[in-house]
Design a protein with these regions (language model features):
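Short glycine/threonine-rich beta-strand-turn micro-motifs
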Residues: 52, 77-91
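Long, amphipathic coiled-coil
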Residues: 1-30, 34, 95, 113, ...
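Flexible hinge/switch segments at interdomain interfaces of large molecular machines
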Residues: 29-45, 106, 142-155, 186-193
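Divalent metal-dependent catalytic cores for phosphoryl transfer on phosphate-bearing substrates
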Residues: 156, 167-171, 176-226
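Short amphipathic alpha-helix segments
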Residues: 52-66
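OB-fold/S1-family RNA-binding modules
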Residues: 87-146
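Interdomain boundary/hinge elements
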Residues: 5-7, 13, 17, 35-46, ...
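Pre-Walker A segment
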Residues: 130-174, 180-186
């Protein structure tokens, strides 16, 4: 009987280790390295006459808008539309919102463009922080520093494979918490690591590193155990 009990215990330990290995491998496979992101957005115009006003005399208006927002504005033969192109989703959103307000207002000149971009930038930065705070509150995660909150909030404006990255990160955090409970490891730590797993996708600066490496570096600078 003692031998049978020993064999059963060893079998159980082996099964638990195998289950943990399977779960870890599965999670890794569900975190692809390549980010497929939408880098362009279209702004509708009331008429094609608006294209000339957006360009401005000697191109001053469009140059001002591109310089202030860091995007490329493409004006071609597409009827009643212009295209905004930028890899940074926050810059793209600021440019889109600014251009839509300028078109609606009708006053389009360098001084007005600067005024609108400044206002929209302030609003978007506030939105970033609010979305980061909301995500952490929903998950019950505490003591994240300001940089961490903002890094998460930037993901609100990012999509990857057709999904909002902040929503995806929250879902991963909830799944990680449940899995951690099942395999007997720290749920809070798992949840915290999971919510941060994609922050590299929202990095403000372009990098040759993949998003996981960028995110790990960001987490270390934020004081997280990466």
């Amino acid at each position: 009987q003692a031998m049978i009990n020993k064999i059963e215990q060893e079998a159980q330990l082996t099964a638990e280790k195998k289950a943990k290995d399977v779960l870890v491998t599965t999670i890794q496979r569900l975190a692809p390295e390549v980010t497929s992101d939408i880098t362009v957005t279209t702004v509708s115009l009331p008429s094609d006459e608006m294209k000339g006003r957006i360009i401005g005399r000697e191109g001053r208006n469009i140059r001002t808008l591109e310089t202030l927002t860091g995007v490329d504005i493409i004006i071609d033969d597409t009827p009643e539309a212009v295209v905004i192109s930028c890899f940074d989703p926050v810059r793209k959103e600021i440019a889109k919102e600014s251009l839509e307000r300028l078109i609606s207002d009708g006053r389009i000149h360098p001084a007005r463009i600067e005024e609108v971009v400044q206002k929209v930038t302030h609003e978007i930065q506030n939105k970033i922080y609010e979305e980061g705070e909301r995500a952490l509150f929903d998950l019950g995660i505490h003591n994240m520093n300001t940089d961490g909150v903002r890094a998460l909030g930037r993901l609100y404006f990012r999509t990857s494979y057709g999904q909002n990255v902040l929503t995806h990160s929250k879902e991963v955090a909830m799944a990680a918490s449940l899995i951690a409970a099942e395999i007997g490891v720290d749920r809070e730590l798992a949840k915290r690591a999971a919510i941060l797993h994609d922050i590299g996708k929202g990095a403000e600066n372009d990098s040759d590193q993949n998003h996981a490496e960028v995110g790990a570096e960001m987490a270390r600078k934020m004081g997280e155990d990466a």
